[in-house]
Amino acid sequence: MSEMVILDTHIWFWFINGSFERFPAQWLEQIRQADIVAVSAISCYEIALAHNKGRLEIHIPVQDWLTDSLAPAGIELLPLTPEITVRAVNLYPIHKDPFDRLIIATVLEYGAKLASVDSLFSKYPELESYLM
């Protein structure tokens, strides 16, 4: 079975922009060695929203950044499916952010490893074996 790593939105942004010091050093090797590196479609929305609100500096049009930061960068885009959305709704409400709940549900649906520095993710017992 191939290993998939799903990047939380901030990890994806840092990875693409070469800000490797922002996450644990061993993750870079795990990400590079994974058979599939992916992001949830909701991460595109989070990037565009953060950029639109001035919380994220991107020096090219955000649409170009998103396009360049997916397939050309070796990152697979995972869709939001009915199963993922229902699973996100049914998660215990530890994390109030619906975007993060959708990322958690995506990880669980795909059985993938999750790269995130969000401390709330570790409070989900069902994520225990999926966190990097």
Predicted region positions:
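Acidic, PIN/NYN-like endoribonuclease modules and their adjacent C-terminal/linker elements
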Residues: 2-4, 104-132
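A generic structural signal for short hydrophobic patches within well-formed alpha-helices
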Residues: 12, 44, 85, 121-122
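Acidic catalytic patch
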Residues: 66-93
